[in-house]
Curated annotation (Swiss-Prot):
Recorded superkingdom: Viruses
Protein name: FP protein
InterPro entries cross-referenced by the UniProt entry: FP_N (IPR004941)
Length: 208
């Protein structure tokens, strides 16, 4: 045993290091699970931007506008479980993720404006399925890079959904590498059989 080993208990030190590693792995695993729980929770909610009324902090006012939105978009207000106001938008908890997608889809089809809600302000009202900040950032990067070639780009459960038009394939973008791949390669080649591989591995998940 050398002098250094005499000064410290090597076995105890190794045990402490291994314990620290195990705790670090547990923390990483816990963070992953928390993110999954947050994503699942948000999938049942929508975020509504653009309603030009300073009273949205009041639940009574939010309910008033939500009922108007439901009437205009042919949605069932019974699916609304709760609502909150966060910074510059409403967050609406719905009964399930299918309802959240329905709200987003009908909002795109009918293009609500403040005038539609009886507000004297010329600005759009937009509804999106709720998502964590990192997914919103990925959505912004995908839109900046791929529009207007890809006309349909939106948040979905596992990332960002990308498609060229209503009848083309749908791809799931999960990181910037996927965005860059679509941007730098033949954007129309993905409709060809077998063209959806890079370096022998599938880079994007085809969900159709």
């Amino acid at each position: 045993m050398d002098r250094f080993e005499q000064l410290i208990n090597v076995a105890l030190l190794k045990s402490l290091i291994n314990t620290q590693i195990d705790e670090s792995d547990d923390i990483k695993s816990m963070n992953v699970k928390l993110k999954e729980l947050e994503r699942d929770r948000l999938n049942d909610s929508v975020e509504i931007y653009g309603v030009h009324d300073a009273r949205l902090g009041s639940k009574k006012m939010r309910t008033y506008y939500l009922k108007k939105i439901c009437a205009l978009l042919d949605l069932d207000f019974k699916h609304v479980l709760d609502s909150a106001f966060h910074k510059n938008h409403m967050v609406v908890k719905l009964s399930d993720s299918a309802r959240a997608k329905e709200w987003q889809s009908k909002s795109r089809e009918r293009r609500l404006k403040n005038h539609s809600l009886g507000i004297d302000y010329d600005g759009p009202v937009k509804i999106f399925v709720a998502a964590p900040p990192e997914q919103k950032l990925l959505l912004k990067k995908a839109r900046d890079a791929l529009l207007p070639v890809y006309k349909y780009i939106s948040i979905c459960k596992h990332g960002v959904m990308v498609r060229r038009d209503e009848k083309s394939r749908v791809f799931i973008v999960k990181d910037e590498q996927h965005i860059n791949y679509l941007k730098t390669n033949d954007l129309f080649a993905f409709d060809k059989a077998g063209a959806f591989r890079a370096d022998g591995q599938r880079m994007l998940e085809n969900i159709i």
